[in-house]
Amino acid sequence: MSNIIKQIEQEQMKQNVPSFRPGDSVEVKVWVVEGSKKRLQAFEGVVIAIRNRGLHSAFTVRKISNGEGVERVFQTHSPVIDSITVKRRGAVRQAKLYYLRERTGKAARIKERLN
């Protein structure tokens, strides 16, 4: 039974997901339905957490919008996601960057990874 589930999950998974880590700045383009119209909406921010669980993988992106912190959790293999673009690589030493929630301005900056 578990082989059937694994096979179905494997078929559902996207193959073109770029590799990114916590601390990286990414732009996620998401399909949004408003009434009868369908359009792309971009959400750009810093990846603060990644959850690797196969088909159920997710990542959290945080940005500051009008002085207010906004976080959004995306399912990595969701059909709603059109594309994920890595804008900048960040050098951090933790897997979860929840400490950025308390920081603002220059204190919330992340060094750029050079390699």
Curated annotation (Swiss-Prot):
This protein is located at the 30S-50S ribosomal subunit interface and may play a role in the structure and function of the aminoacyl-tRNA binding site. GO terms for biological process: translation. It comes from Sodalis glossinidius (strain morsitans). GO terms for molecular function: structural constituent of ribosome. Coiled coil: none annotated. This is Large ribosomal subunit protein bL19. One of its GO terms (cellular component) is cytosolic large ribosomal subunit. Keywords: Ribonucleoprotein, Ribosomal protein. It holds the Pfam family Ribosomal_L19. InterPro entries: Ribosomal_bL19, Ribosomal_bL19_CS, Ribosomal_bL19_sf, Translation_prot_SH3-like_sf. Belongs to the bacterial ribosomal protein bL19 family.
